[in-house]
Amino acid sequence: MVCRVTRIADSFAWPFRNRPAATWAIGLLAVLVLPVGLLPLLGYAVAATRAAEQTPGDGPPRWTFSARLLADGAWAALAVLLTLLPFALLWHPLGMLLGAALDPFYAHVTAALLLALPWGMLALVHMPHATSRFAATGDPRDMLDLAGAARGVRRDFQAWNLVAAVIVTAWAVGLACAAALCVGIVPGVFYAILVSAHAAAALQRPNKDLSTR
């Protein structure tokens, strides 16, 4: 239990370890210029996961702009899109159905909120395992392997459950602190990305303190 608590706490502190200034400056810029910065940002998230797998004691890696960064970002973006697509296709029909009782605008807002929860659950099942495997192997098939991610969750549910809790908490804390400190949403988003990368890396490490195997 102590190891698990330490690992979780380490994920939350990891974004500030070692070279934080340059890493954060470029990361904040990438978030600020979204959607233009989407591919570099997602590519860096993969690179951060890879770094946390290889040297978990170090901080986030330096930004290295390369073809691999953009390619990794493109594969990660495609994986997110594939998890989102079924719910995007359901959004308008559900909004029309709810429109029988609500104003069309509020009906579509309600539909989006109703679909956000199952999409978030699917993303939590797929993205941590897929990202950790893709970061380790570099094989795009790992990034898109939803069935493999689901098997990973079933095989090591305790580890996935703790990692998912870290990711959800990081996004909640990041956005809440950004609002509370009046610094805007940009730092909170980048902080959550870094914490998520470090947490996902725990699923790939050979010596898994979180594993039940």
Q: Model segments located where?
A:
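Short, small/hydrophobic-residue-rich motifs at membrane-helix boundaries and re-entrant hairpins
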Residues: D10-W14, I26-G59, A67-M121
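Interfacial aromatic "cap" segments that immediately flank transmembrane helices
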Residues: T6-L32, W63-L89, V125-A176, A202, ...
